[in-house]
Amino acid sequence: MVGPAMPAVTIHELRKRFPRTTALDGLSFTVQAGEVVGLLGANGAGKTTTLHILLGLILPSAGRVEVFGQAPRAHRKAALRRVGFASPEALMDWRLTVAENLRVFAGLYDVPREAVPRMIERFELDPMADQPFGELSLGQQTRAGLARALLHDPDLLVLDEPTASLDPDIADKTRQLLLRVRRERGLAILYSSHNMTEVEDVCDRVVFVHHGRVVAEGTPLAVSRQVLGSDALDAASMEEVFLKISRDGVA
């Protein structure tokens, strides 16, 4: 008999204290393999701190974090080989060309160099492959950042505001690209965003965080009904959920 699949992400009673503030106060949630989960909340809710702990960039004060059953700090190389990360900053060298950036990253992860031109073609980066990353538009930088994040074929993609500062048309194209990647690869995605329309389109479940705690969790429809008591779900209702939780802090 085959047992249940191991969660892609397990976060249990996570706490993080800084000298003047408590960023996380008993945060708990999971992301199952192949699932897309939105991590939502106002600025200062604890989303970025959660992602930094998950990526092994900072240590928690207490609690447990696992990526496919491994602690990111204790097994950093093994755990993070299974993780791709993309954010507006994209972790790219702005002086290098797109192709050079991808080749550097391929070398770090022992990815065959021939994977780079394939990824450039797949993300429609051919026209700007030989341009310095810093000269690209925001939409092009976002695509290049996603290409870098997926180059080593991860099982989990962590996205921090992937469409922030993009105009609506480019944001929609980026969203469609993410949906295509999800369909093709079946990878788990942890998706931090302020864009509620985007969340509805992309996420299977949402986790709302307020002052370092989970205050609502479930499908977008379930959370909307829990918070607003409504029977309908549309973009406006999810915006209302976000505003109510940001204002009141409790569902």
Residue ranges: model-predicted function:
Residues 153:
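Conserved catalytic motifs of ABC-family nucleotide-binding domains
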